[in-house]
Amino acid sequence: AAGDMVLAMIRNKGGIGFVTDSPMRDLVGIQDVGLPAWCNGLNPNSPYANGPGRVGFDASVGGQIVSSGDIIVADIDGVVVVPHARIDSVIAKLDAVRAAETAMEAKVKSGFSEQSRILQMLNDGRAVMDD
């Protein structure tokens, strides 16, 4: 499990964040390092000092394949991988997505309580409401 020393070394080399599909250790120390980190839990065990490990290869993290050149976007809610080949198309859609989310937020604040898509899923049996 990576911990505060590993994150400090990553920060010292210019890293701006750390994402792992494994647990991490030394939570208080990690917070003190100040490098944002995402993991799947906490564990007091030390990392392997002699491997296994590979650098520069595709990796599966959280069920997603991550390749060199991919963009990683992360916040408090989680981590998203944007494949390098799709970066331009994703960027092209950002304004439309922001506008749709802003419009939906305004509708919900005004009292909106259901979406037709959800009702359609309930009506055609693709979703079930549990009272």
Positions of the model-derived regions?
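Channel- or pocket-lining gating/hinge segments that regulate access to a cavity or pore
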Residues: 78-80
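Feature captures the catalytic cores and cofactor-binding loops of soluble hydro-lyases/lyases
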Residues: 1-68, 82-131
